[in-house]
């Protein structure tokens, strides 16, 4: 029985990781509003090494269409601008001598559809991850030295777990798509 619980717990952990990864990936997909997470991939040259932007500056959103970046050291302003340009996010940073300001342009309908497709692809990847965890759990259950009744009920449990996680992925995707398509 312990072996079965271990297999189920392992499958659940893997599925949870797929959900976590999906959320992280979706947070990088930009919806209409400005958010500090949009700059999560920006690296800045800081004393000779590449450093994440969040470690060298505060990123704020004064309003829904603007990102304000306050560097901890004013000498970093040009490096921050360069980092944003190199990250290829489609932003045009401006500096006022003390901070870097980014006006986030509104998304076009075509771009919204592209982002929606990207979100669907990420969700599908997460579903594949969940299904792979199910497959692995099923194989391990078959290898386990357990009765047929226990095997059947355990397989049903794994399938139920899989269905639950697939539903969660669909809900997360629906929320993100709504966020993307909202003008």
UniProtKB/Swiss-Prot annotation:
Example GO molecular function: ribosomal large subunit binding
Location of the protein in the cell: Cytoplasm
UniProt KW DNA repair keyword: no
GO BP annotations listed: translational termination
Span of the signal peptide: none
Record's keyword terms, sorted: Cytoplasm, Protein biosynthesis
Keyword check for Methyltransferase: no
Membership in a protein family: Belongs to the RRF family.
PANTHER family registered for this protein in UniProt: MITOCHONDRIAL RIBOSOME RECYCLING FACTOR PSEUDO 1, RIBOSOME RECYCLING FACTOR
HAMAP family the record matches: RRF
Role: Responsible for the release of ribosomes from messenger RNA at the termination of protein biosynthesis. May increase the efficiency of translation by recycling ribosomes from one round of translation to another.
Protein name from the UniProt record: Ribosome-recycling factor
Organism per entry: Christiangramia forsetii (strain DSM 17595 / CGMCC 1.15422 / KT0803) (Gramella forsetii)
Gene encoding the protein: frr
């Amino acid at each position: 029985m312990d072996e079965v619980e271990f297999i189920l717990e392992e499958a659940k952990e893997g599925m949870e990781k797929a959900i976590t990864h999906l959320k992280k990936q979706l947070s990088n997909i930009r919806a209409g509003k400005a958010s500090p997470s949009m700059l999560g991939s920006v690296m800045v040259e800081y004393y000779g090494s590449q450093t994440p932007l969040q470690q060298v500056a505060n990123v704020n959103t004064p309003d829904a269409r603007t990102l304000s970046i306050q560097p901890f050291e004013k000498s970093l302003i040009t490096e921050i601008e360069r980092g944003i340009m190199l990250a290829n996010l489609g932003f045009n940073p401006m500096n006022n001598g003390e901070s870097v300001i980014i006006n986030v342009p509104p998304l076009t309908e075509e771009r919204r559809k592209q982002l929606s497709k990207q979100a669907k692809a990420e969700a599908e990847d997460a579903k594949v991850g969940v299904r792979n965890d199910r497959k692995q759990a099923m194989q391990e259950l078959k290898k386990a030295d357990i009765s047929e009744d226990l095997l059947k009920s355990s397989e049903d449990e794994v399938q139920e777990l899989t269905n639950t996680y697939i539903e969660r992925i669909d809900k997360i995707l629906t929320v993100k798509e709504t966020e993307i398509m909202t003008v």
